[in-house]
Amino acid sequence: MKEVKEALFMNKGEGESSYAQNSSFTQTVTSMTMPVLENAVETLFSKDFHLLQALNAVDLGCAAGPTTFTVISTIKRMMEKKCRELNCQTLELQVYLNDLPGNDFNTLFKGLPSKVVGNKCEEVSCYVVGVPGSFHGRLFPRNSLHLVHSCYSVHWLTQAPKGLTSKEGLALNKGKIYISKTSPPVVREAYLSQFHEDFTMFLNSRSQEVVPNGCMVLILRGRLSSDPSDMGSCFTWELLAVAIAELVSQGLIDEDKLDTFNVPSYFPSLEEVKDIVERNGSFTIDHMEGFELDSPEMQENDKWVRGEKFATVARAFTEPIISNQFGHEIMDKLYEKFTHIVVSDFEAKIPKITSIILVLSKIVG
């Protein structure tokens, strides 16, 4: 089995279950939060960043959907607006698109709109380059980044939480793949501890790369509840665990594979995020809020259409990490079972999806 950093990516290509074809919700979240990104660019210009010849920005965990193009276009448009207002010199925008090496960079760059890049723009020339690697470590030289953006990436962990096996070698989260109502407290504690460790590494790395007064706009999956096992946080993973368990009962998957697998992801609360940032001490929190949105599949009246769409979207971002543990050959059967479970057990209501948006400024000194 591959390590997390080798297996964690969204479904590749442009097929029916690809991330490129199933990232509309992420795009919606990005569009909703664009005013925050626009304000961040405004703030940078108020701090005399327009005196620079080039502004360096990065989209961390960019994946391969159209979301990152919206980010680039927004930054470029705001820079052009501020250049006109301030009558400043022609600026250059350098954008780095980062994700783990397994990301589908080919599809990403094939889809890059020509109007976004090039050097013939009247006010802002834009250059885009891919940067494969883990954002939990250093990616860029010291004091080289002015603006950092990330959408739906920071909640992914570097590994499954440590300490989920007893001294006797027994699985402590047996039959589950994430935190659930039946998980013992040690599972919840292990997940929070792993997120604390990884998010701290993320902040430490960015604190060296971001210039003083530079800005980060981070959007991640999270929760409004203090309970990490609330259905809004664990819905997809809970249903996938049920589907996997059914295949175990049919002898198609080894039970040990289910009992020893824990998803490397954690949806934190606002309080947990705030505590980690404040403990780190490298950034000030300029803005932080949580908001809920209905899953787009809830707009469908037919329960089978709703279930199939939800399963297809879920497959786009869960299949690579799930197939790494359970095998590619079982995936079609697994997600077919998953669809049936969504329809039969949860046809009334798919929980709202909670996001956290966080704006951080690098402390001077």
From Swiss-Prot:
UniProt binding sites for caffeine: T26, Y152, H155, W156, R221, F317
Q: Does the keyword Methyltransferase apply?
A: yes
Domain of life from the UniProt record: Eukaryota
Query: Gene encoding this polypeptide?
Result: TCS2
Name of this protein: Probable caffeine synthase 2
Pathway linked to the protein: Alkaloid biosynthesis
Identify the residues that bind Mg(2+): N173, D259, F261, N262
Q: Which GO terms describe its biological process?
A: alkaloid metabolic process; methylation
What this protein needs as a cofactor is:
Mg(2+)
**This enzyme's EC code(s):** 2.1.1.160
What keywords are assigned to this protein? Answer: Alkaloid metabolism, Magnesium, Metal-binding, Methyltransferase, S-adenosyl-L-methionine, Transferase
Which InterPro entries does its entry note?
MeTrfase_7 (IPR005299), MeTrfase_capping (IPR042086), SAM-dependent_MTases_sf (IPR029063)
A Pfam family in this protein? Answer: Methyltransf_7
Q: Which family does it belong to?
A: Belongs to the methyltransferase superfamily. Type-7 methyltransferase family.
List residue numbers at the site (Involved in substrate discrimination). H149, R221, S265, V313, H328
Amino-acid positions noted as binding S-adenosyl-L-homocysteine in the UniProt annotation, renumbered to this chain:
Y19, C62, D99, L100, S134, F135
Summarize the protein's role: May be involved in the biosynthesis of caffeine. Catalyzes the conversion of 7-methylxanthine (7mX) to theobromine and of theobromine to caffeine. Has 1-N-methylation activity.
The species is: Camellia sinensis (Tea plant)
Q: Which reactions are catalysed by this chain?
A: 7-methylxanthine + S-adenosyl-L-methionine = theobromine + S-adenosyl-L-homocysteine + H(+); theobromine + S-adenosyl-L-methionine = caffeine + S-adenosyl-L-homocysteine + H(+); 1,7-dimethylxanthine + S-adenosyl-L-methionine = caffeine + S-adenosyl-L-homocysteine + H(+)
MF GO annotations: caffeine synthase activity; metal ion binding
How is the co-factor bound, per the entry? Binds 1 Mg(2+) ion per subunit.
